[in-house]
Regions:
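Catalytic cores of the polymerase beta-like nucleotidyltransferase superfamily
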Residues: 1-264
Length: 264
């Protein structure tokens, strides 16, 4: 932060790392936002990091690694989306509030300004209150957010699973309404989010959300179809419920005895 400040730039910790720090679970992957242009951020990172890469520079992002710590520094930006793609047209923004407004959920739209005399907590969308209430809500209108980037609907189910949060009713209704938009997302991106749901502490919650919102009908139709399958031994209400229970038992077994993170 001091290197950015010395060159007249601002730097703020932002997004997931702020959320996780408030939850007492800050990791080694840190995201920052700045008013410095990517080329300037790269120069500063080159002075600090052991390795620097700029594969995301077209979107304003430069990354670096030092020891076990990985950082991504992204220039303030605004985004405009084509209706048939989740890849945005990026324009550099003027302030951090505009940058935070593009985030997926309010709990990910908080920042900690590090180049002021004292660290300043920035929370224009009441993310701290939503964090305390364990609620997923969008900074703006949910329809706008999910139309812009339909993958955020999968992320809602993932965060609900990982953090044991509830999705605000208006957000949940928007997901049901716009579930069909998930079709523009690549299979690889969908797979990654679904894997994170499976690896979460409460996969039942995320999978149930995918089924109840209609997302599963489009990305993994085999799952909701299990509800139509009858357990021939009548030990369970349906094959879906049985499958979820087996998954939970497998996770409990792995947590108790240790084992691979994921085998499919």
């Amino acid at each position: 932060a001091q290197s950015f400040k010395a060159k007249g730039f601002t730097l703020a910790l932002v997004g997931g790392p702020v959320r996780d720090a408030l939850l007492g679970r800050l990791g080694n992957d840190l995201d920052f936002t700045t008013n410095a242009l990517p080329q300037e951020s790269k120069k500063i990172l080159n002075e600090w990091a052991e390795n620097v890469w700029d594969t995301g520079i077209a979107f304003g992002t430069v990354a670096g690694k030092r020891g076990d710590t990985t950082v991504e520094v992204t220039t303030f930006r605004t985004e405009h989306y084509d209706a048939n793609s989740r890849k945005p047209t990026v324009e550099y923004g003027k302030d951090i509030n505009g940058d935070l407004s593009r985030r997926d959920f309010t709990v990910n739209a908080m920042a900690l300004e590090l180049t002021t005399d004292k660290p300043e907590f920035i929370d224009p969308f009441n993310g701290l209150q939503d964090l305390a209430e364990k609620t997923l809500r969008t900074p703006g209108l949910p329809n706008d957010s999910f139309n812009d980037d339909p993958l955020r609907m999968m992320r809602a189910a993932r965060f609900a699973s990982q953090l044991d949060f509830e999705i605000e009713p208006a957000v949940l209704n928007s997901i049901k309404e716009l579930a069909h938009r998930i079709s523009i997302i690549s299979a690889e991106r969908v797979r990654d989010e679904f894997t994170k749901i499976l690896m979460s502490s409460n996969p039942r919650k995320g999978i149930t959300l995918l089924v109840d919102t209609g997302l599963a009908d489009l990305v993994l139709p085999e799952i909701p179809k299990l509800r139509l399958e009858v357990d021939e031994h009548h030990h369970h209400k349906d094959v879906y419920e049985h499958s979820i229970t087996v998954l939970e038992q497998a996770i409990e077994h792995e947590d108790r005895l240790g084992g691979p993170n994921l085998v499919i």
